[in-house]
Amino acid sequence: DKFFYPELSALAEVNAMEARSMNRNPTPWNNVNLTALRIGSLNCAGLQAHYADLKVDYSLLKADIIHLSETSLTGLGDCQYPLPGFDVDHCVVGNGKGVSTYYNAKIAEQKVCLQLIKGDNFQISKVTLPRVDSINVYRSSNASIPGTLEALKKLIDEEKPTLVSGDFNLCYKRNPSNTLTARLLHDGFTQLVEDATQIQGGLIDHLYWRDCLEPIFEVPVVERTSSYYSDHDTLLVTLAEKSIS
């Protein structure tokens, strides 16, 4: 009988590749063994147009909270655009505007409240949880920056960890000192996104994070994916609480 044996160097390389694989080394977003709050933010370029795509966006669906902007809903009728395992609240304004927030059963049990701010040219959603608040903003390019900032500031709890996400239509690279960003940074927030988020090269999708003076959370881990159905990147934030020593 003849036997075939693997080349030892080839076998060693296979084992090395396996050790480096994503299955063995999942990112925080994909690590099922990591207890954390996962928040996804995406300009979906129209919820009705891309509803079927969202239902199979398995990376985004790992979120506990999904913030969608520029949903372009003109009305709901009998369709709430449900995602399996999620509740949803929509802020319906019209074409090229609007935000929707989906949250899973774990969040529904904890949720203190959900607020929606419906401006003509900006919309804001806030999910209040016992330990952290998650705020999402869609600001049209012609919206008043001071007006958007004023509405946002009214929703921010100065004593609580807060994540602010969304499409601000303000390029952080070209205009990092804009009034809204400058004020949030002055108030102790950190802008977590460093690279362009939109296909034309603008960094217009922002993530602002501020913890308590005595931090409750580890430094947020930001991951991103490029969805085929939107010209914006999806921003995925993993928030893990600090272990009590």
Task: Name each model feature, range by range.
Residues 1-79:
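N-terminal, active-site-proximal structural segment of metallo-dependent hydrolase catalytic domains
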Residues 46, 72-74, 106-108, 139, ...:
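Conserved beta-strand elements of beta-rich interaction domains across eukaryotes
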Residues 1-15, 162, 171, 186, ...:
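Surface polyanion/phosphate-binding segment centered on an Asp-His-Pro turn
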Residues 67, 101, 133, 163-164, ...:
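Beta-strand cores of modular interaction/reader domains in eukaryotic scaffold and signaling proteins
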Residues 71-131, 137, 215-225, 233:
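Structured beta-strand-rich core segments of catalytic domains in phosphoester-bond hydrolases
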Residues 49-53, 142-149:
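Active-site-adjacent loop/helix micro-motif of nuclease/hydrolase catalytic cores
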Residues 56-93, 146-213, 227:
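Metal-dependent phosphoesterases centered on the DNase I-like endonuclease/exonuclease/phosphatase
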